[in-house]
Amino acid sequence: MMNTALQKKCACRVVRLAVACAGVIVLTLTACASGPKPLDWQLEAKGAMERSVAAYLEGNARVEAVEFARAKTEVSSTGRVDLMARAELLRCASHVASLVFEPCAGFEKIRQDAPLAERAYADYLGAALQPKDAALLPPQQRLALTGGDAGVKGMSDPLSQLVAVGVAFQSGRASPAMVQLAIDAASSQGWRRPLLAWLGVQASLFDKNGLVEEAARVRRRIVLTQGDLKAPR
């Protein structure tokens, strides 16, 4: 049974622009029954950003691009650099989760005006975070940065896990256990793109260690995951 205070808290409706995945909450808007409803741009941006991230992780780059452009249009109407920075970072986080390492070009265009926390997160995604800036990271990513395998395993959000292992992989710190955690996280959500990427890493690790049968098993799983697709679109 919930106590009265918790019931009152739950009576409020929380609307997020995008998901709280990857440790980045793009925007949180709380609307209680007695308060104003979320504005149209907030709802449109939220929906488009969520669809964009989902499409990318499922392997559909075309839909991702369309939905991300829609989200940016809505966010740009506010003139707020912090919101645009977070939208760009969420997109880049989904790429890092899928082992696509490239400059976060959209964010870099507005870096000089972005808040310090967003700059730190961008550096983190590029495996270039300065130790002094670690405190600026979202709590789950700080945990992963310092906690190793246990830190990643303790993360509650699948995309946060994938991003953390992706950053560790860039830095040469990803253990076989972390790779398995990334595989499990992607598989649990049906995210084809990162699953294929991390299965490829695991197969290479088995090859490197002379584990022929294990490598062959993983490659059969890759074929199964691809289905009728030769590669993510």
Q: Predicted segments — roles?
A:
Residues 200-233:
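A cross-kingdom marker for long, charged
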Residues 28-31:
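C-terminal motif of bacterial Sec signal peptides marking the signal peptidase cleavage site
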Residues 69-73, 111-112, 183-187, 204, ...:
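Amphipathic alpha-helical segments of tetratricopeptide repeats
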Residues 117-191:
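Extended amphipathic alpha-helical interaction segments
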Residues 37-114:
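N-terminal Sec/ER secretory leader and immediately downstream segment
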Residues 44, 84, 175, 195-196, ...:
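Residues that mark the junctions of alpha-helical repeat units in TPR/alpha-solenoid scaffolds
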